[in-house]
Curated annotation (Swiss-Prot):
Role this protein plays: Plays an essential role in the initiation and regulation of chromosomal replication. ATP-DnaA binds to the origin of replication (oriC) to initiate formation of the DNA replication initiation complex once per cell cycle. Binds the DnaA box (a 9 base pair repeat at the origin) and separates the double-stranded (ds)DNA. Forms a right-handed helical filament on oriC DNA; dsDNA binds to the exterior of the filament while single-stranded (ss)DNA is stabiized in the filament's interior.
Region of interest (Domain III, AAA+ region), ranges: 111-329
Residues covered by region (Domain II): 77-110
Chain coiled-coil ranges: none
NCBIfam families, alphabetized: DnaA
Lineage: Bacteria, Bacillati, Bacillota, Bacilli, Lactobacillales
Protein name according to UniProt: Chromosomal replication initiator protein DnaA
Annotated binding of ATP, by residue: G155, G157, K158, T159
Subunit structure: Oligomerizes as a right-handed, spiral filament on DNA at oriC.
Residue span of region Domain I, interacts with DnaA modulators: 1-77
Family: Belongs to the DnaA family.
UniProt region (Domain IV, binds dsDNA), positions on chain: 330-451
Gene name of the encoded protein: dnaA
PROSITE patterns xrefs: DNAA (PS01008)
Entry keyword annotation includes DNA-binding: yes
Length: 451
């Protein structure tokens, strides 16, 4: 990269980071690469699904950086990651020794969902370790963490990560023997083969895999299915002894799989156990920003933030809300989704689903102030002593995390402050939490008092 290209790209990243929320920037911009700038055309390498976001949101950024560095209007030519991967993969396929085709083992249908990848998985603090572990397993299956056990509530991305691991391994090695299956379907297959007296086929199918991906392993924890547990135990041992990768997901930790045999629980803990928790507000905004690319509607930022505040339990609720909105907007022939339109469209879903507790900002200010020895009135005022500033910024952070209020609304409740002040406080506290365990504990203590 030439000096001017480096300056241009640094400026693009700087402008993008100043305009986007951190989680949005991390997902849509962080992994993009400038390949070259030639004849006023910038060639940018990124995931194809992110092209529309760049076209909609970053055109002005590129134009600004172009005029600053080259004193010219810079256009963009996107090179997609998928195209390069396919090209590289085809080369690998062509290079495979012919004797691999003579493999005597029966073919296995992976049952992977090709739409799930690491590239389109939205990362946040609540899932960062799970993503990192999944990528490590995909890069070196059978060696790094075996088994990998991912647990968390429904709709948080466990199935997405399982499929992303499988798709990544398959992309690197098209001949890999991979199987994605739910524990329930494993049970069903076991029952069928028992009835047909074809257990040898089941054993051959599962014990010769390179990668086994089991979803919702808690379904195996049923006392009436001891025969199934025995078969899975033997399958696990056969794969693990041959350094074949096993990844499992569950809605609870291994120690809480109460009806599972102890010897299985022990093996589940041999490798690495990671947790996924519900996405925070900023991650929910990033998820929505990504998902709305699939719809032909305009979603203003205040609508996105409103929706992010309405559903705080899992990703499926967010996806379902967008489908509700799309249905209503298509029927009414609406192009722009305002907060009022979104609220009307999701009303039934909110009534049927779990209610998000309405927490007054005054309560957050009162509890935050009490913890740090200041009053709610002082938090709203302009005084800037150290303990008041910390209490104020923590309260702003919690107001954004625990309510569905927009940034301007939160700023108004803090003495009429600008929305940028709220955003600065939120980002500052979030960064401090990642580096200061004592502050994280303090904030969790305040949250528990508010709830």
């Amino acid at each position: 990269m030439t000096e001017n290209e480096q300056i241009f790209w640094n400026r693009v990243l700087e402008l993008a980071q100043s305009q986007l929320k951190q989680a949005t920037y991390e997902f849509f911009v962080h992994d993009a690469r400038l390949l070259k700038v030639d004849k006023h055309i910038a060639t940018i390498y990124l995931d194809q699904m992110k092209e529309l976001f760049w076209e909609k949101n970053l055109k002005d950024v590129i134009l600004t950086a172009g005029f600053e560095v080259y004193n010219a209007q810079i256009s963009v030519d996107y090179v997609f990651e998928e195209d390069l991967m396919i090209e590289q993969n085809q080369t690998k396929i062509n290079q495979k020794p012919k004797q691999q085709a003579l493999n005597s083992l029966p073919t296995v249908t992976s049952d992977l969902n090709s739409k799930y990848s690491f590239e389109n998985f939205i990362q946040g603090d609540e899932n960062r370790w799970a993503v990192a572990a999944s990528i490590a397993v995909a890069n070196t299956p059978g060696t790094t963490y075996n088994p990998l056990f991912i647990w968390g509530g429904p709709g948080l991305g466990k199935t997405h990560l399982l499929n992303a691991i499988g798709n990544s391994v398959l992309l690197e090695n098209p001949n890999a023997r991979i199987k994605y299956i739910t524990a329930e379907n494993f049970i069903n297959e076991f029952v069928i083969h028992i009835r047909l007296d074809t257990m040898d086929e089941l054993k051959e199918k599962f014990r010769n895999l390179d990668l086994l991906l089991i979803d919702d392993i808690q379904s195996l924890a049923k006392k009436t299915l001891s025969g199934t547990q025995e078969e899975f135990f033997n399958t696990f041992n056969a794969l693990h002894n041959n350094n074949k990768q096993i990844v499992l997901t569950s809605d609870r930790t291994p120690d809480h799989l109460n009806d599972l045999e102890d010897r299985l629980v022990t093996r589940f803990k041999w490798g690495l156990t990671v947790n996924i928790t519900p996405p925070d507000f900023e991650t929910r905004v990033a998820i929505l920003t990504n998902k709305i690319q699939e719809y032909n509607f305009i979603f203003p930022q205040d609508t996105i933030e409103y929706l992010a505040g309405q559903f705080d339990s899992n990703v499926r609720d967010l996806e379902g809300a967008l489908k509700d909105i799309s249905l209503g907007a298509n029927f009414k022939q609406i192009d722009t989704i305002t907060v009022d339109i979104a609220a009307e469209a999701i009303r039934a879903r909110k009534q049927d689903g779990p209610k998000m507790t309405v927490i007054p900002i005054e309560e957050i200010q009162a509890q935050g102030g009490k913890f740090y020895g200041v009053t709610g009135k002082e938090i709203k005022a302009t005084k800037r002593t150290q303990n008041i500033v910390l209490a104020r910024q923590v309260a702003m952070f919690l107001a954004r995390e625990m309510t569905d209020n927009s940034l301007p609304k939160i700023g108004k409740e803090f003495g009429g402050r600008d929305h940028s002040t709220v955003l600065h406080a939120y980002n500052k506290i979030k960064n401090m939490i990642s580096q200061d365990e004592s502050l994280r504990i303090e904030i969790e203590t305040i949250k528990n008092k508010i709830k």
